[in-house]
Amino acid sequence: MKSGLLLAVILPVAFAVKKDQQSCNSSCVKVLQKQQESCPSGSDADCLCKLSDSDYWEPLTDCDCINPDKKLSASEIKVQICGAPSSSSTPTSSTETTSSTEAETTEAETTEQPSSSTSSNTESSKTTILETPSIQELNAESTTSVITPLTESAVAAVANTDTSTLIEPQNTEATPEVAPLIQPQLNNGSDLAQVSVQAFENGAGRAAVIGSGSLLALLLNFI
């Protein structure tokens, strides 16, 4: 059908131009020349439909042999010969482009989220490390707090201690006073009994009594 319409429209123009150059205007001549250059066969509708509007279809509209009253526009003539263009291909491609763009954007956002969380974790861990005191500082503080009180208490204890009390302890036990022994008098028979009684009263032991008696016996023998 397209080929028949093309022959019915284009071929008469070609014959008219060849038969009588003055029967058609210059636009018809331009259309015929472009047709012969681009589509030598003359009946190839696909070849003519690929031609641009400015090179072929608009001059064809101005051709008085084809469109004497200019009732048809270039697009209408092109639709009659080439058919209506399919508009479904363009929206489909744009939809695919939009969906692919959205998918790339989603992937980029998904990739950026772990990076931001990792940086925040790194910052929080750095902050925690900076705020934690070092082991040396803790050891220094604990050593100072332990040694200082012990040193001060030791010095105070030494300063308040009476060295004489530690070195020379006093014996608090009362020492019994020993009454002096009465020296026996010579030529007195009661001297031995008196010495014995005096010795027992003064808390003297048996050895003291025996010693006094022996001494008295020696004195008596000497007399």
UniProtKB/Swiss-Prot annotation:
Glycans are attached at N25, N188. A lipid is attached at N202 (GPI-anchor amidated asparagine). Residues 83-134 are annotated as: Disordered. It is found in: Secreted, Cell wall; Membrane. It is a lipid-anchor; GPI-anchor. Residues 1-16 form the signal peptide. GO terms for cellular component: extracellular region; side of membrane. Residues 203-223 form a propeptide. The GPI-anchor is attached to the protein in the endoplasmic reticulum and serves to target the protein to the cell surface. There, the glucosamine-inositol phospholipid moiety is cleaved off and the GPI-modified mannoprotein is covalently attached via its lipidless GPI glycan remnant to the 1,6-beta-glucan of the outer cell wall layer. Probable GPI-anchored cell wall protein that may be involved in cell wall organization, hyphal growth, as well as in virulence. Belongs to the IHD1 family. This is Probable cell wall protein PGA61. It comes from Candida albicans (strain SC5314 / ATCC MYA-2876) (Yeast). The lineage of its organism: Eukaryota, Fungi, Dikarya, Ascomycota, Saccharomycotina. The gene is PGA61.
